[in-house]
Amino acid sequence: MSNLVDEFNSDMWTVYTGAKEECNYNATRYLQMISNRGGLATAKKLLAENKSQYGLTALYKCNRLDLTVEALVLKEKYRSLFTEKELKAARKRLGDLHYVPTY
């Protein structure tokens, strides 16, 4: 599972880079969190928060919800890293924005 966690952590960095390059969104808090906690712990923390995520809104406005933590979490290969409650939170947030991942 450690290789899967490493892949997930790497993809969390890719999410940051993609959001910055594609949407000119500089996610400073997100960057600090993945630098300090790692990608998996950051994703779990963000999914546990009940408040609206500014980054999700910014990426929605840019029409790039595929670059969200929620979309990454729902990828088939990463689902085993998360609880059903966390997966449900990711699905709900994306569903509220009428986004359905295509994978």
Features from the language model and the residues they span:
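Polar/charged alpha-helical tracts
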Residues: 10, 32, 41, 85-92
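Charged, low-complexity surface segments at secondary-structure and domain boundaries
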Residues: 1, 14-18, 29-30, 43-45, ...
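Amphipathic alpha-helical packing elements
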Residues: 16-64
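Alpha-helix boundary/N-cap detector
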Residues: 3, 7, 34-37, 81, ...
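Charged, compositionally biased N-terminal leader segments and the immediate start
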Residues: 1-22, 96
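Acidic/proline-rich low-complexity IDRs
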Residues: 3, 55-58, 66, 71-73
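Amphipathic alpha-helical binding modules
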Residues: 63-103
